[in-house]
From Swiss-Prot:
The keyword Transcription applies. It comes from Glaesserella parasuis serovar 5 (strain SH0165). The lineage of its organism: Bacteria, Pseudomonadati, Pseudomonadota, Gammaproteobacteria, Pasteurellales. Heterodimer of an alpha and a beta chain. SUPFAM superfamilies: IHF-like DNA-binding proteins (SSF47729). InterPro entries: Hist_DNA-bd, Histone-like_DNA-bd_CS, IHF-like_DNA-bd_dom_sf, IHF_beta. This is Integration host factor subunit beta. This protein is one of the two subunits of integration host factor, a specific DNA-binding protein that functions in genetic recombination as well as in transcriptional and translational control.
């Protein structure tokens, strides 16, 4: 499901809400999540899951085109861990 499909589904489910208000709400929620991660914070949505940052050590990678070794710097990457309720609902599907 894309963001556009999510917005369309929400508008269909809640006809009293406008497309614009749903679109702005979804964008703001995503912006808050990204902003918190940018600040190094962990986000937890009970029953759904948590977003955090994982540290990746510097390493030597390989350019797949040339086979040349490339030094990759250390970095933080976003990580999502599904919550118990989400895992259970997916398992039943």
């Amino acid at each position: 499901m894309t963001k556009s499909e999510l917005i369309a589904n929400l508008v269909a489910q809640y006809p009293s809400l406008s497309v614009k208000s749903v679109d702005e709400s979804v964008k703001e929620i995503l912006e808050q999540i990204m902003g918190s991660l940018e600040q190094g914070e962990r986000i937890e949505v009970r029953g759904f899951g948590s977003f955090s940052l994982h540290y990746r050590q510097p390493r030597v990678g390989r350019n797949p085109k040339t086979g040349e070794s490339v030094k990759l710097d250390a970095k933080y990457v976003p990580h999502f861990k599904a919550g118990k309720e989400l895992k259970e609902r997916v398992d039943l599907a």
